[in-house]
Amino acid sequence: MTMRDDVPLLDRELVDEAACGGEDGELPLDEQFSLSSYGTSDFFVSSAYSRLPPHTQPVFSKRVVMFAWSFLVLKPLELVAAGMYYGWTGRAVAPACIIAAVLAYYVTWLARALLLYVNIKRDRLPLSPPVFWGLCVIMGGAALCALVAAAHETFSPDGLFHWITASQLLPRTDPLRARSLGIACAAGAAMWVAAADCFAAFTNFFLARFWTRAILKAPVAF
């Protein structure tokens, strides 16, 4: 008889399922508790109350769709808006900080994908503790940089509001008025969205692993 973890592996055809259960063929109480953890109403499972489609084909969750939209559409638009703001106003500090923060996000994702590929092939965890903390510093620094740049450019005397006010003083028939207001508003929205997006990425990366460490009481870098 073959053994695995001190449990005999028997042919399923030789097992009397009714005899293994309790009364009327029911499972023992301990097995019922074990199997209940796989139910769809588990409070601690994030997808427990998600609406599952009737078909059995794999589908993307809303988080995956939002990530793809942010990664492929939103962040490139932030880069374009920052570049247009620099080209129109000549102010380079805030656009450079926003562009650096967005590029840092892409670099960290590329590094995580590369480490995941290399370490999984070596049967290791994707991240080591030093790499995890290094990525936390990079992502947290990028988020802080984007926030400071957005706040400074928005509320400085010669910043975003100054350009909006100056644009509103132009004649309504002047085509530069609408162009200047559009670029300024788009750049302002892009800067604050970039700051919020960077902070969301940092907290999502850090808190998930911090919570896992607190639950398992062991450093698990994944």
From Swiss-Prot:
Example GO biological process: viral life cycle
Membrane in keyword set: yes
Membrane protein topology class: Multi-pass membrane protein
Keyword Coiled coil tagged: no
Chain ranges passing through the membrane: 64-84, 98-118, 131-151, 182-202
UniProt cross-references to InterPro entries, sorted A to Z: Herpes_UL20
Subunit structure: Interacts with gK (via N-terminus); this interaction plays a role in the coordinate transport of UL20 and gK to the trans-Golgi network (TGN), and is required for their cell surface expression. Interacts with gB.
Descriptive protein name: Protein UL20
Species for this entry: Human herpesvirus 2 (strain HG52)
